[in-house]
A protein has these predicted regions:
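Histidine-acidic metal/acid-base catalytic patches
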Residues: 2-70, 74-87, 97-100, 181, ...
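Active-site acidic/histidine proton-transfer and metal-coordination neighborhood
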Residues: 3-5, 36-39, 87-95, 102-103, ...
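Short active-site-proximal "capping" loops at secondary-structure junctions
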Residues: 57, 111-112
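Short, histidine-centered active-site or binding-site loop motifs used for metal coordination
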Residues: 110, 197, 239-241, 305-307, ...
Length: 360
């Protein structure tokens, strides 16, 4: 069992979560998911390829626009950001082991702190990648996909690949270059493009064609670099219609697939589809899966759900058995997701602040 460097467990008192069947009264047991049970000749673990999102599980604080952080995370004691990031790796892999989850996903800035310069950012990322690599070797856990955070830093206020500032475009390209290299080093099965700020707030001051052309050029550069370093993982494009921008260029599967074909990227990139993003686009998740599947672009999914009564991305854990059945029906219909998987892009609610709540 993974332990922190001081020899203690982050989730002491919680054992490995196991399948106990539908009649179990154990709240920390699987009732329906039996990893080794065969379905259509394949183990359930191979159908799902479950992954934990590093950003929600290990970086979420519970803060919102109306109040500060609520999450109790006893392991967050280091004052040095890099030391804290390296300690967090042990916590993450203990969680993966106890949950029985084979994969994880991350943005570069989830796992390593931002530095004052690009060189410092890369140095920090390399240091954490050392720890991630050792943890993977020790536990057998794998990286489903990596990506770069091109939306949080103020430099990306006008976008990254679509920024009107050439220096911002160049910085973003360098950041993606490094993120792909680290994903490759860690044996990642894929890499995701999600342009959180690749869009507009007002068309009066937006040259849409130019921005979309720049986005395509940016993605071609990433594909070319992947070939140069020998990265053979699958590239994914993740649709989302808005938030934080009024309109985003990766609106839905139809928009993204048209973009990929128009710009000669269709042989390199498939779709990473999120349920809550489909809701924001006015679609059911099954619609997005069917559209991508029939076009040959179904790649991976982010498993969550949204609240149809609110207009933003709530990233709730999926609890609707009819919705999840529809999703799996479409996935099986189109031959499964591998090398993609099912990433739990869902966060515990602000009121669920104890470490054990991560397992529930």
């Amino acid at each position: 069992m993974t332990q922190q460097r001081n020899g203690t467990e982050a989730f002491a008192g919680i054992g490995r979560i196991r399948y106990e069947g539908p009649t179990t009264k154990n709240m920390l047991a699987f009732r329906h998911y039996d990893p080794e049970a065969l379905v259509e000749g394949r183990p359930m673990r191979d159908h799902f390829r479950f992954a934990v999102s590093y950003w929600h599980a290990f970086r979420g604080t519970g803060s919102d626009p109306f109040g500060p952080a609520t999450m109790v995370r006893p392991w967050e004691t280091a004052t040095d950001p890099l030391e804290a990031a390296i300690r967090r790796v042990d916590v993450a892999f203990e969680f993966l082991e106890k949950l029985g989850c084979d994969f994880y996903c991350f943005h570069d800035r989830d796992v390593a702190p931002e530095g004052a310069t690009l060189a410092e950012c890369n140095k920090n990322l390399d240091a954490v990648a050392d720890a991630l690599e050792k943890a993977q070797q020790r536990t057998g856990k794998k990286l489903l996909w990596g990506t770069a955070n091109l939306f949080s830093h103020p430099r990306y206020v006008h976008g990254a690949a679509t920024s009107p500032n050439a220096e911002v475009f160049a910085y973003a390209a360098a950041q993606v270059k490094k993120a792909i290299e680290v994903t490759h080093r860690l044996g990642g099965a894929g890499y995701v493009f999600w342009g959180g700020r690749e869009g507009y707030q007002c068309l009066w001051n937006t040259d849409m064609k130019r921005e979309i052309d720049h986005l395509a050029r940016f993605m071609h550069m990433a594909v070319d670099h992947a070939k140069q370093i020998g990265f053979t993982g699958q590239f994914y494009f993740e649709p989302k219609p808005r938030e934080p921008m009024k309109h985003q260029y990766d609106y839905d599967c139809a928009t993204c697939i048209n973009f990929l074909r128009t710009h000669g990227l269709e042989k390199h990139v498939k779709m990473n589809i999120e349920t809550n993003h489909a809701t924001l686009a006015g679609h059911e998740m099954q619609h997005e899966l069917e559209y991508a599947g029939m076009q040959g672009f179904l790649g991976s999914i982010d498993a969550n759900t949204g609240d149809t009564l609110v207009g933003w991305d709530t990233d709730q854990f999926p609890t609707n058995v009819y919705l999840t059945t529809q999703i799996m029906w479409s996935i099986l219909k189109y031959g499964g997701l591998a090398p993609g998987g099912v990433n739990f892009d869902a966060k515990v609610r602000r009121e669920s602040f104890e470490p054990v709540d991560l397992f529930h």
